[in-house]
């Protein structure tokens, strides 16, 4: 049986790893073993952060909506509650875009939400009763 030397395959594999690790600093871009290890970590980070990015964008949208809502004298929580009660189905991404691009339309949505909200039982009453 003929002996199989893996010269071509091994060099091709090493070349592909080193090519993929081109932008890394120091030994991680030049030495195969270090480059391979860094490549594994990099792919793990990329996989993890593609999923984390979705949550980060949601946080950003909520912050933007909250800022615009408070400028209209309502909290984010009450705004979302009112929009759900009014049957307005607009997601947070589009709501944040509306808040930035078209403040007048956002104010109209706030008015719709306010009209659909039940009376706040925790709000201070104007009847003058002392607690």
Curated annotation (Swiss-Prot):
Keywords noted in UniProt: Ribonucleoprotein, Ribosomal protein, RNA-binding, rRNA-binding
Lineage: superkingdom: Bacteria
Entry's Gene Ontology molecular function annotations: rRNA binding; structural constituent of ribosome
Disulfide-bonded cysteines: none
PROSITE patterns xref list: RIBOSOMAL_L20
Position of the signal peptide: none
Gene Ontology terms describing biological process: ribosomal large subunit assembly; translation
Record Pfam families: Ribosomal_L20
Gene Ontology terms: cellular component: ribonucleoprotein complex; ribosome
Family recorded in the similarity comment: Belongs to the bacterial ribosomal protein bL20 family.
Protein function: Binds directly to 23S ribosomal RNA and is necessary for the in vitro assembly process of the 50S ribosomal subunit. It is not involved in the protein synthesizing functions of that subunit.
Protein's name in the database: Large ribosomal subunit protein bL20
Species, as recorded: Mycolicibacterium paratuberculosis (strain ATCC BAA-968 / K-10) (Mycobacterium paratuberculosis)
């Amino acid at each position: 049986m003929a002996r199989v030397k893996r010269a071509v395959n091994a060099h091709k594999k090493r070349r592909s790893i080193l090519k993929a690790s081109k932008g890394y600093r120091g030994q991680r871009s030049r030495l195969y073993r270090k480059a391979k290890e860094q490549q594994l970590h990099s792919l793990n980070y990329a996989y993890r952060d593609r999923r984390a990015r979705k949550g980060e964008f949601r946080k950003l949208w909520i912050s933007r909506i909250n800022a615009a809502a408070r400028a209209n004298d309502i909290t984010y929580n009450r705004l979302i509650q009112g929009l759900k009660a009014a049957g307005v189905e607009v997601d947070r991404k589009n709501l944040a875009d509306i808040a930035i691009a078209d403040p007048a339309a956002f104010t109209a949505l706030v008015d719709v939400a306010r009209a659909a909200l039940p009376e706040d039982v925790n709000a201070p009453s104007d009847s003058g009763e002392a607690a």
